[in-house]
């Protein structure tokens, strides 16, 4: 007898599987067929589950019951969302994937939970990802995290301010160092290259880094405060690791990589014993995926792979992309207890200015880094005054003024 719905996939529930050895992906599905009041969601769910595990579009003899029992994903949750539209069916679906299928291989895990499944429905989003304990043990996570960065910067309780070097590219190494020196004088805690700059023809990493660090040290001799500089090293994986080593040899006390380098490359970089400085993950490349993968999922994966700090969307941004709840949930995922994995510093960002300090800190709390480019450098009294205005705004909020 042929069953319409495979028992190996559907005769399951969350309470009955070995959660320690599974990854559980939660999806939002929404389908609409005009004039069709019957939508077979379970057939769609079955296709999603098999696509991320054992499935082929045509049954083959090697695809046995034993193979599916051991390797296929299992539907452990189906929660239909009521709709007044008879032609719409929406649900939150949970699929459990066995870790044995790919071990601690992050690219393969991402392929399973967020690969061809997106071809099966116009409205499908990966909303959460539960990582089983046996898989979690195999990841180091951030080396520094919130506590390590606080110790490095000397800022133990309040939010940190960060100067984004602007314009994105085009400046010489000397101009870059000069700009950093001015914001360091104003008390900025950190600075970073723009994500678009790595090795421009007129401003390579090896050219600017020594000049920037020299300027930071010059200011530190006067103020007693040494700014952390996150130097951009995004490149091909092996080149990026070599570049990171070179940057540290040249005095870098922080590194910046982008999501476009890949989660595997991020993990390789952050877990390498030679990399003894914090690593920031820039999330701009994630915007291309935000309609299909929720930001908290991406934040969780980046924390898992070792990001010490990571940009966080906020509705107060000049380019708001998410709701308040989605932005805050992204921050919570970075800070919530998670076994041995250290906390990742959230960085609510994009077009923020000192006048937003109260609402940003009120919503996100003190464990944040606030990056500002034009919102610091655009001060009418200059770059130093812009950095000072951020320090004053943060101090006022923390004092309850």
Regions found by a protein language model. Give the residues of each.
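Acidic/glycine-rich phosphate/pyrophosphate-binding loops and surrounding catalytic core
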Residues: 106-178
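Active-site mouth loops of central-metabolism enzymes
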Residues: 26-38, 159-178, 227-239, 284-293, ...
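Catalytic alpha/beta core domains of metabolic enzymes, predominantly
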Residues: 242-245, 250-372, 385, 389
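Phosphate-/polyanion-interacting regions in eukaryotic proteins
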Residues: 56-137
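N-terminal small/glycine-rich loop or linker at the start of catalytic domains
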Residues: 23, 141-171, 217-227, 272-287
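Alpha-helix-loop-beta-strand connector modules within alpha/beta enzyme cores
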Residues: 52-53, 57, 67-68, 203-231, ...
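Short Lys/Arg-enriched alpha/beta "domain-start" segment
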Residues: 1-71
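Glycine-rich, proline-tolerant flexible connector loops at the mouths of alpha/beta enzymes
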Residues: 188-209, 314-317, 321
């Amino acid at each position: 007898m042929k069953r319409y719905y495979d028992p190996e996939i559907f005769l399951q529930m969350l309470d009955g599987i070995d959660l320690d050895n599974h990854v559980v992906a939660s999806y939002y599905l929404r389908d609409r067929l005009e004039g069709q009041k019957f939508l077979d969601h379970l057939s769609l769910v079955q296709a999603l589950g098999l696509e991320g595990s054992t499935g082929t579009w045509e049954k083959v003899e090697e695809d046995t019951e034993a193979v599916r029992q051991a390797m296929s994903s299992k539907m452990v949750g189906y929660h239909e969302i009521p709709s007044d539209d008879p032609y719409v069916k929406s649900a939150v679906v949970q699929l459990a994937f066995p870790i044995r299928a790919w071990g601690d291989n992050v690219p393969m895990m991402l392929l399973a939970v967020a690969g061809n499944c997106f071809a099966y429905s116009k409205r499908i989003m990966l909303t959460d990802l539960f990582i089983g304990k046996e898989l979690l043990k195999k990841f180091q996570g951030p080396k520094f995290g919130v506590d390590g960065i606080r110790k490095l910067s000397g800022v133990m309780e309040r939010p940190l301010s960060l100067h984004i070097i602007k314009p994105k590219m085009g400046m010489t190494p000397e101009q870059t160092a000069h700009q950093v020196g001015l914001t360091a004088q104003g008390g900025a805690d950190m600075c970073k290259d723009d994500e678009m700059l790595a090795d421009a023809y007129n401003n390579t990493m090896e050219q600017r880094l020594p000049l920037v660090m020299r300027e930071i040290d010059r200011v530190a001799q006067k103020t007693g405060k040494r700014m952390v500089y996150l130097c951009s090293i995004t490149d091909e994986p092996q080149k990026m690791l070599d570049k990171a080593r070179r940057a540290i040899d040249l005095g870098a006390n922080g590194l910046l990589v982008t999501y476009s380098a890949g989660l595997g490359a991020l993990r390789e970089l952050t877990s390498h014993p030679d990399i003894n400085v914090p690593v920031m993950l820039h999330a701009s490349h994630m915007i291309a995926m935000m309609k299909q993968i929720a930001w908290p999922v991406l934040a969780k994966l980046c924390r898992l792979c070792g990001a010490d700090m990571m940009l966080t969307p906020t509705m107060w941004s000049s380019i708001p992309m998410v709701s308040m709840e989605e932005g805050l949930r992204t921050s919570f995922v970075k800070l919530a207890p998670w076994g041995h994995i250290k906390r990742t510093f959230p960085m609510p960002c994009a077009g923020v200015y000192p006048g937003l300090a109260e609402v940003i800190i009120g919503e996100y709390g003190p464990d944040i880094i606030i990056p500002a480019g034009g919102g610091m450098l655009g001060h009418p009294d200059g770059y130093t005054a812009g950095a000072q205005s951020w320090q004053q705004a943060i101090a006022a909020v923390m004092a309850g003024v």
